[in-house]
Each structure stands twice: as C-alpha cells, then as structure tokens.
Regions:
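Conserved blade-ending motifs and adjacent loop-strand segments that build the rim/top face
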Residues: 94-115
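Blade-level signature of beta-propeller repeat domains, shared across WD40, Kelch, NHL, RCC1
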Residues: 112-143
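Small/polar loops that bind or transfer phosphate-bearing groups
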Residues: 76, 103, 122
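Beta-propeller domain segments
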Residues: 1-97, 129, 135-138
Length: 143
C-alpha cells in the first residue's frame, strides 16, 4: 500500500460489492461500482487480494531480529478468518513470493510488533486475551 494511491474502494473491487444502503454521493453509479479492472477506472491495481475478504485489521513489518527466515516479512491480522497471515514480498515489492496462514482460532482485533522483546502481540476479540508470538518458540500463548 503506497501513500496517496487510490486502490478504488468502494468503486472497484476484486471481491463482492456491498452497496446496500451505501450512498456517499460520489459520481460513480451503482452499475459502475462492480467494475473489476482497477486501471481502466483510474485506480491502482492491487498486487494481491484476499477473496473472500479476511477483514484485515493491522499490517506489521517484522524487523531483522525477529527470526532470520521471517526477515522483512509482514504479518496481517484478520477478523474474518481467525488466522494470522505471513507475507513475503520480492525485493521490489511488486509480487508476493510466499504467503502462509497461521491458525489462531480467534478474531485478531489488533496486532503490534514489540521489537525490544522480539515478539508480536495480538489483541484477540473472542476471549479478550492477548496472544503473543515469540521469536524463539513460534507458538501462540494466550493470557
């Protein structure tokens, strides 16, 4: 995601359109809103889309000291799928080289990387717990 780029929502979508009761007064008619080609509408094309939507909550970049094999990876929190997603881009950030679903079992409301302690902290919605993904164990602890 780049600053000042328009990815088209809610006019253009790779997934389902949710237009019931939606009226923002823009110049696009409802018939134009389900248009799949972002570029033809003047929007930036995403390099990857979660279809169906996973309900992205937070995206964090993992710094070098977390785990060598996860160096410069991103973690994506999800409300819909109850998974954490690990994503590795190519060097130019033009395509995804690797993507992994990590089962958490709860909706991830928020996600933060604690570089001082080399851990990822997740606010879990269903139980109100904190989930911690630690550098050494790579397992999720619920508190």
């Amino acid at each position: 995601i780049y600053k000042d780029k328009n990815y088209g929502w809610p006019i253009s979508s790779d997934g389902n359109m949710y237009v019931d009761g939606y009226n923002d007064g823009d110049e696009y008619s409802l018939s134009q809103r389900n248009y799949k080609d972002h570029e033809d509408m003047g929007f930036e094309n995403p390099i990857f889309s979660f279809i169906p939507s996973i309900g992205i909550t937070e995206i964090v970049e993992l710094e070098d000291e977390f785990i060598e094999t996860w160096k410069n990876n991103f973690l994506v929190g999800s409300l819909n799928s109850k998974h954490l997603y690990r994503i590795k881009f190519d060097k130019e950030f033009k395509k995804i080289n690797y993507y992994e679903k990590i089962f958490v079992g709860e909706r991830i409301r928020d996600l933060k990387y604690d570089s001082r302690n080399s851990q990822v902290i997740m606010a879990l919605e269903d139980s109100g717990s904190l989930g911690i993904l630690k550098k050494k164990s790579i397992k999720i602890n619920l508190f």
